[in-house]
């Protein structure tokens, strides 16, 4: 295996054992970006000179016996939406083309405090709101495995850079699949953590207090071990909340696969997937069963997935429409008032009118009153309870992230 294919935790061990220097590793990644990223277009903000300087500092610290942290000397990139001091943060939006961060965001600071340094930032779609990664400022990012196909979005540049061997570690954000679908399309690891575990401070265009509802920050990497390492670094309360709570995540409650109880949800009539995706998901479940895990292909959480998705759409669109202008909001309000209520029930969706239900939920969410938001939030809490009850019995729910593999631009 080539060194650029190794995980960040493996690379950190090599740096600390002096098998490779941080400067050598950083230069290797820079050389690969300069040679291959012209076709992929993943690393769109470049800080190569600063990265070499930071790598040299890491090597000097190591020579003095200093340990900078679990990522000592690791060069990395990060999603363009994160603030890095003196670098542009645009979210792919022309209106913010000249927006320059005055300081590092919290996640960036925490990665630096763990010993990492940054070579640049990776591409996103406009306003982080697409399953591909194109914007008019930086252009289109391609999938490293097939340049004709998308890398996913909105953390598409992050996943593409990892898959291409341009970086040791990445971080993205996710409100509707923005970490998960790029990881799926590019064949890397991604983790969308529970909301509230990782502060969003420094992942915004305009300072936003409190954190956005539903949206989360999280890592992308080349291994599950890297995800754990990065989560441990990123997680924990922001400074303003640190006196009120502390993070205490549960430790794994098993030591071998034979102790695991795994539920497999390979497809569903509400969200059918391709035969290939269903077969691969099923194969993983069958393999786990052969290795001794207790596996069920029938176990499900106790709620209606059609209703759950419609409720999610209400809450999602209420977040996405927060900055909507009065004129546009009035148009959507009129459309909502003209909806055919008989087609907007969960029963109607099950009978075949799913699209109408989801479109109606999206429109309603954009103009949701506070009273109706509270009702939707109440339903969300009931769903949380259903999930908690499910995971009291099952350790893992294995299901597809997307219905298909990466599709063409």
Predicted regions and their residues:
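An N-terminal boundary/leader segment
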Residues: 1-54, 290-292, 362, 366-367
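Conserved small-residue hinge/capping positions at short loops/turns
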Residues: 67-90, 117-119, 123, 129, ...
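Acyltransferase
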Residues: 22-26, 56, 273-301, 326-337, ...
């Amino acid at each position: 295996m080539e060194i650029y294919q190794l995980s960040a935790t493996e690379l950190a061990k090599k740096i600390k054992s002096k098998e490779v220097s941080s400067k050598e590793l950083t230069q290797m990644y820079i050389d690969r970006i300069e040679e291959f990223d012209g076709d992929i277009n993943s690393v769109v903000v470049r800080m190569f000179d600063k990265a070499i300087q930071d790598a040299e500092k890491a090597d000097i610290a190591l020579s003095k016996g200093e340990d900078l942290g679990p990522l000592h000397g690791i060069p990395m990139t990060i999603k363009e939406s994160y603030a890095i001091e003196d670098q542009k943060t645009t979210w792919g939006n022309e209106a913010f083309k000249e927006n320059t961060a005055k300081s590092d965001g919290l996640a960036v600071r925490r990665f630096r405090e763990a010993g990492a340094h940054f070579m640049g930032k990776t591409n996103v779609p406009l306003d982080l709101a697409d399953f591909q990664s194109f914007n008019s400022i930086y252009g289109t990012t391609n999938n490293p495995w097939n340049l004709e196909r998308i890398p996913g979005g909105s953390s598409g540049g992050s996943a593409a850079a990892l898959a291409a061997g341009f970086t040791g570690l990445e971080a993205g954000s996710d409100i509707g699949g923005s970490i998960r679908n790029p990881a799926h399309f590019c064949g890397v690891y991604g983790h969308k953590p529970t909301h509230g575990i990782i502060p969003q401070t420094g992942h915004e265009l305009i300072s936003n207090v409190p954190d956005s509802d539903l949206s989360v920050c999280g890592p992308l990497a080349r291994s599950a071990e890297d995800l754990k390492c990065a989560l441990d670094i990123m997680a924990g309360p922001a400074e303003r909340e640190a006196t009120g709570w502390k993070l205490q995540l549960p430790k794994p409650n098993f030591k071998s696969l034979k102790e695991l109880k795994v539920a497999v949800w390979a497809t569903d009539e509400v969200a059918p997937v391709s035969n290939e995706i269903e077969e691969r998901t099923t194969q993983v479940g069958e393999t786990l069963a052969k290795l001794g895990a207790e596996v069920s292909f029938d176990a499900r959480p106790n709620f209606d997935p059609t209703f759950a998705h419609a409720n999610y759409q209400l809450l999602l669109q209420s977040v996405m429409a927060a900055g909507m202008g009065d004129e546009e909001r009035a148009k959507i309000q009129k459309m909502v008032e003209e909806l055919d209520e008989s087609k907007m029930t969960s029963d109607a969706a099950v009978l075949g009118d799913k699209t109408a239900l989801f479109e109606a939920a999206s429109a309603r969410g954009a103009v949701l009153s506070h009273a109706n938001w509270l009702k939707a939030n109440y339903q969300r809490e009931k769903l949380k309870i259903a999930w908690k009850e499910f995971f009291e019995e099952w350790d893992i729910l294995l299901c597809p992230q997307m219905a298909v593999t990466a599709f063409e631009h």
